[in-house]
């Protein structure tokens, strides 16, 4: 595309006046050097010049500017408009509850694993071995959930328990008891208001949510969990005894299992109602 005829060039500054001859000389000495590299070297050499060495070029630039203003009194510099870059939006394929923004911002690898499982349920990214064996899929999802929500020590123990229980025919029933044996190494861990898991692959992710509930109970020092009367999918961690006591504590967290709708939240399970 040819430039318009009435285009007026900007007046040269002191560096441009000095670099005219220097650029031509350097291009002759280095014919294969790119123009950007030549400009970079010329800029470094210009900074090394003293004020007395720059003075003649500064005076010449002032003279050229005065001549330019006399020839083009209505001249106005109009820079080229650069296209605005589109802002990139953060996309999370794995549902992250409130209070875990730092984990999402840090691009936690376990979140990427959860995103892969979530996308694979509908897009075929999950290996066929995991689809054929829901026990192994449950163990893998439980380990990924433990790495996100619990410290490294508790997460390692949870992953080991899930892997050990995956080979047993009663793994889903025995996984909670194995997870309860983990020592409470992170008693100060805050609970999220709700933990949302993907609804695809109910058999595999049911075991994952059960493992996460057991890990939450072990981390917080709870002895067992109660199912909510309104929906058995809600597991409430609790450390109440068989006999009623005045120091009963309210539930600390609700864990939503896949395939269950969100009912009216019941703050106290049937055990509390019977005790009262």
From Swiss-Prot:
A GO CC annotation given for this chain: nucleus
The protein's role, per its UniProt record: May play a role as an activator of transcription of OPRM1. Overexpression of SOX21 can up-regulate the OPRM1 distal promoter activity in mor-expressing neuronal cells. May play a role in ameloblast differentiation.
Name under which the protein is recorded: Transcription factor SOX-21
Keywords: Activator, DNA-binding, Nucleus, Transcription, Transcription regulation
Name of the coding gene: SOX21
Transmembrane domains' residue ranges: none
UniProt-recorded Gene Ontology molecular function terms: DNA binding; DNA-binding transcription activator activity, RNA polymerase II-specific; DNA-binding transcription factor activity; DNA-binding transcription factor activity, RNA polymerase II-specific; RNA polymerase II cis-regulatory region sequence-specific DNA binding
Keyword Repeat attributed: no
GO annotation, biological process: brain development; hair follicle development; negative regulation of transcription by RNA polymerase II; neuron differentiation; positive regulation of transcription by RNA polymerase II; regulation of DNA-templated transcription; regulation of transcription by RNA polymerase II; stem cell differentiation
Record's signal peptide: none
Localization, UniProt: Nucleus
DNA-binding region range list: 8-76
Ligase recorded as keyword: no
